[in-house]
Amino acid sequence: MSSQELVTLNVGGKIFTTRFSTIKQFPASRLARMLDGRDQEFKMVGGQIFVDRDGDLFSFILDFLRTHQLLLPTEFSDYLRLQREALFYELRSLVDLLNPYLLQPRPALVEVHFLSRNTQAFFRVFGSCSKTIEMLTGRITVFTEQPSAPTWNGNFFPPQMTLLPLPPQRPSYHDLVFQCGSDSTTDNQTGVRYVSIKPDNRKLANGTNVLGLLIDTLLKEGFHLVSTRTVSSEDKTECYSFERIKSPEVLITNETPKPETIIIPEQSQIKK
């Protein structure tokens, strides 16, 4: 086949047309083997080579094949997924090029919304990382007072209150809610909700005390308080924002990138 001939790829439903010479820029890649018929995973369907991969990310890969440069939007964040695609196509230099971006520290964010109303306190915790919310869910226990059945032993004894442990509610993977303080039960009796946060064994009903313990827990997990504000002037909900800089868990080490491969931020390009 002539290097000037065109090839059409269907990658995840997106159509790309390029030259054979572009695909063969990296002879050791799976894309080059695809043209030689040496890789059976790529099938010819209706005159197009079908590839069951991410079409949106392939546009960056094809641009890299054409220019030996990686041009990414300023808001791009899917470095791990893009590197996974580069590994699939066995584009070693692109894999190496993405490594520094995977090694950059990324902040984990937490927001604590706190509302104190009369003798009740309400908490809602948002987290950018679901694992942080899972950690807090495993540590926080809400205890509700439940009256036990009255006992008879010649004389009547009033029902005793027992504590029923409950986990905080999880509206989504990224938040949890709970409350403490007085609690109106279904029989119009007033009980109390207590909150315990491991490893502290205390059962606290005062909202301010629970807030202090929750903040202390986040600080011990490496978070830093970055701001406080009032979310709503009507109900005076307080918001405490925390941040933790932590390297990503998935780290891949490869050879040094080739000197001819560079990343150019999109905003630095001159649009034609």
Curated annotation (Swiss-Prot):
Positions of the BTB domain: 5-106
One example of a Gene Ontology biological process annotation: protein homooligomerization
Tissue expression remark: Ubiquitous in normal tissues and expressed in some tumor tissues.
Gene3D superfamilies referenced in this protein's UniProt entry, alphabetically: Potassium Channel Kv1.1, Chain A (3.30.710.10)
Cellular location(s): Endoplasmic reticulum
Gene Ontology molecular-function annotations: identical protein binding
Record bears the keyword Endoplasmic reticulum: yes
Cellular component, GO annotation: endoplasmic reticulum
Keywords: Endoplasmic reticulum
SMART domains according to UniProt: BTB
SUBUNIT field: Can form homooligomers. Interacts with KCNA1 (via cytoplasmic N-terminal domain) and KCNA4.
Function: Inhibits potassium fluxes in cells. May regulate Kv1 family channel proteins by retaining a fraction of channels in endomembranes.
Protein name: Potassium channel regulatory protein
Record organism: Homo sapiens (Human)
